A protein has these predicted regions:
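A residue-level marker of the well-folded mature domains of exported/periplasmic proteins
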Residues: 1-165
């Protein structure tokens, strides 16, 4: 968001809310409804079933939501801009290959991202439009080739955000 604000020359305000649940859709709907009534244009949920309520609130408010885990546009084709995909199949394939190569995989933590094609955004993007989609894909490329390194924690984010000013 900070990167987009700088690129667009706009002030974008982020309002983070926590549902303290991954399954309570009614809580997600209540939080998103309040955010929309307070002037929020887009709500990005990252909380499993809670997000179903967020998407329902977006439909009712005629606003936008960003889905998570898989392409959730089918839930509200006029309201889900895009989704943050977790391509678990790719992670399973990578770990399986290590196991098949005889490497010890137990007791390890694996972190996969864009470089491993384990996360991304859906190719379908009619609500985003071609220009926004192509800009996002270009940023994915910059992350993959390490031209841009996304911050991994609050301290890195604060430093990154300061560098954008």
């Amino acid at each position: 968001v900070a990167y987009a604000a700088k690129e667009l020359g706009k002030k974008i305000t982020v309002d983070a809310q926590y549902a303290e649940s991954f399954s309570d859709a009614s809580k997600g709907k209540a939080i998103a409804t309040k955010m929309f009534s307070n002037g929020c244009d887009v709500v990005f949920h990252a909380a499993g079933g809670v997000g179903m309520g967020v998407i329902e609130a977006a439909k009712e408010a005629n606003k936008y939501a960003i889905g998570v885990d898989r392409d959730q546009a089918y839930l509200a084709p006029k309201n889900v801009l895009t989704s943050a995909l977790k391509l678990v199949n790719q992670a399973v394939e990578l770990v399986s290959k290590e196991a098949m190569d005889g490497k010890e995989i137990g007791g390890k933590t694996y972190t996969y991202g864009l470089s491993e094609n384990a996360v991304g955004i859906p190719e379908e993007h009619k609500l985003m439009g071609d220009a926004t989609y192509n800009a996002a894909v270009a940023l994915e490329g910059k992350i993959k080739d390490k031209t841009i390194t996304p911050p991994a924690n609050k301290a890195e984010f604060a430093k990154y955000e300061a560098s954008l000013k």
